[in-house]
Curated annotation (Swiss-Prot):
PROSITE patterns documented for this protein: UBIA (PS00943)
Protein name: Protoheme IX farnesyltransferase, mitochondrial
Functional summary from the UniProt entry: Converts protoheme IX and farnesyl diphosphate to heme O.
InterPro entries documented for this protein: Protohaem_IX_farnesylTrfase, UbiA_prenyltransferase, UbiA_prenylTrfase_CS, UbiA_sf
Chain segments annotated as transmembrane: 163-183, 199-221, 247-267, 269-289, 297-317, 337-357, 390-410, 439-459
Transit pept. (range): 1-42
Bias-annotated ranges (Polar residues): 45-61, 89-100
Region (Disordered): 45-131
EC number in record: 2.5.1.141
Listed GO biological process terms: heme A biosynthetic process
Stated family: Belongs to the UbiA prenyltransferase family.
Compartments, record wording: Mitochondrion membrane
Length: 506
């Protein structure tokens, strides 16, 4: 009975299309599967085929009646294509990743290096100047905002150029030797007619900055049509209409009047005359000459060389006595050599700086109609930059020879000028290609501050007291630099011979 019952139940099982064992085998997930099976499952998934669906489909389509008693190939045939060696080899030989991801690191570096070499001739993009950046900032503010108007007017001044003028002026003022001023005795000779306090320095800095603002504003007033044709200047305030032409003219006149007035009352008339000449030279000579002849670069270099003369004359005026404070005494006196040397350094510096800058945008200068060496004669443009870079050496040595700076300046100036000359030589050799124009431009940006700060640090007599305090060396006084007088009562005269040992030294 039990056997019959079992056989009966077996027959019933045979009539069933599925058994428990086959049902477990047909499940889509496998608890234990080898690595090859997992790879094949991944490949079939990428190809858009689901392993579970293929197993169920092939199994149920091939399972009929009591065929479960014999080995069914349907379950294994569904896995066999993905487990075949040929399919696995194809999966490893043709990965689904992109060529960039499968590229070896050294080949990628080589490819990027070759691409950079092909684009080496392309000129770097020059960023907008400070005026354009301020104009962009001003345009984002509400039209009735006070900050919008202030930013637009400040953009007229070319802030970076104005600060460069201020730096060269104050550096010359600080480099001027003050031993003659400190040695003045009010009981012997009257003090200078001009102020010797720090108020003079404040008048000088404020007046110089306002004068530079006026000159730069006038330059923009005359060139909005041409500024619109260049990428560096097309966002300036007058081009974009952030400031009216009438307001710009009023601003230029006001800054010139206030600046020159401060220089006249706070320094001396010679400084005021130099500043007025610089405004006229930059706005009314250099600006229109840019569209006429390449000599405009030399005129612009003269404009750059005047501010150091202003600082030197302002300092010299503090030690000038009444009757010896004329413009001839200031500009051509015995102590004026330092001012001319500093002015010469700024004059020479303009050429490597501007020639390198103009080379990178020479096509824009040409399109706007500006007569510049960078496109009219590129070879001469490079030669001029190298020539004036070499001129920096004798001008710097001249400051030491004149007794204005110490021996340390010879070292610092040689390093700075050597770097500039090296970049200028590469600029001349490659005619501005291979990144030499950009290298010379940045060398000029750093060379000038290094030179001026080096002159300030190594100023003659600045470290004498420190040197003597550290090494215990007394400061040697030169008796010839001082004048000794006898106290003479009123009405009494001295009738001693100049050669007499007891006569005062004059």
């Amino acid at each position: 009975m039990i056997l019959r019952s079992s056989l009966g139940r077996l027959g019933v099982a045979r009539e069933s299309p599925l058994c428990l064992q086959c049902l477990n085998r047909s499940r889509p997930s496998f608890p234990a599967v080898n690595k090859l099976a997992s790879i094949s499952r991944l490949q079939s998934t990428v190809a858009g085929q689901s392993p579970s669906s293929s197993v169920n489909k092939t199994y149920f389509s091939s399972h009929k009646g009591d065929s479960h008693l014999t080995p069914q190939p349907s379950l294994f045939t569904s896995l066999s294509p993905s487990n075949s060696p040929s399919q696995l080899n194809r999966g490893h030989s043709t990965p689904s990743t992109s060529p960039e991801l499968s590229e070896l690191p050294h080949r990628r570096r080589k490819r990027l290096k070759e691409a950079a070499a092909q684009n080496n001739g392309a000129e770097p993009v020059i960023p907008p100047d400070a005026s354009a950046q301020l104009s962009n900032f001003s345009s984002t503010l509400p039209k009735t905002s006070l900050r919008r108007k202030l930013a637009a007017f400040f953009a007229l001044t070319k802030p970076r150029l104005s600060f460069l003028v201020l730096l060269s002026t104050t550096s010359a003022y600080g480099i001027y030797p003050v031993s003659s001023i400190l040695a003045l005795d009010p009981t012997i000779a009257p003090l200078p007619t001009l102020s010797t306090s720090t108020l003079t320095f404040l008048y000088l800095t404020t007046g110089t900055f306002l004068s530079a603002c006026s000159a730069n504003t006038l330059n923009m007033i005359f060139e909005p049509k041409y500024d619109a044709q260049m990428s560096r200047t097309r966002n300036r305030p007058l081009v974009r209409g952030l400031v009216t032409r009438r307001a710009a003219v009023f601003f230029a006149i006001a800054t010139a009047a206030v600046g020159l007035g401060l220089l006249y009352f706070g320094t001396n008339p010679t400084v005021t005359g130099l500043s007025a000449a610089n405004i006229a030279l930059y706005a009314f000579v250099y600006t229109p000459l840019k569209r006429m002849h390449v000599i405009n670069t030399w005129i612009g270099a003269i404009v750059g060389g005047i501010p150091p003369m202003m600082g030197w004359v302002a300092a010299a005026g503090q030690g000038a006595t009444t009757g010896h404070d004329t413009w001839r005494d200031m500009l051509f006196g015995e102590n004026s050599l330092g001012g001319w040397l500093l002015g010469g350094i700024l004059f020479a510096w303009q050429f490597p700086h501007f020639n390198a800058l103009s080379h990178t945008i020479r096509e824009e200068y040409k399109g706007a109609g500006y007569k510049m060496l960078c496109w009219t004669n590129p070879a001469r443009n490079a030669r001029v930059a190298l020539r004036y870079s070499v001129l920096m050496f004798p001008l710097s040595i001249g400051l030491w020879w004149a007794g204005i700076v110490g021996h340390g300046f010879l070292v610092s100036s040689t390093v700075a000028n050597g770097w500039l000359t090296k970049e200028a030589y590469g600029f001349w050799k490659h005619q501005g290609a291979n990144g030499t124009a950009r290298g010379l431009f940045w060398a000029s940006i750093w060379q000038l501050p290094i030179l001026l700060v080096g002159a300030l640090v190594t100023k003659k007599g600045l470290w004498d007291g420190v040197w003597g305090g550290i090494f215990g060396q007394p400061i040697e006084d030169d008796d010839d630099d001082y004048v000794y007088y006898e106290e003479v009562s009123p009405g009494k005269t001295i009738n001693q011979s100049p050669t007499s040992p007891s006569s005062p030294v004059v």
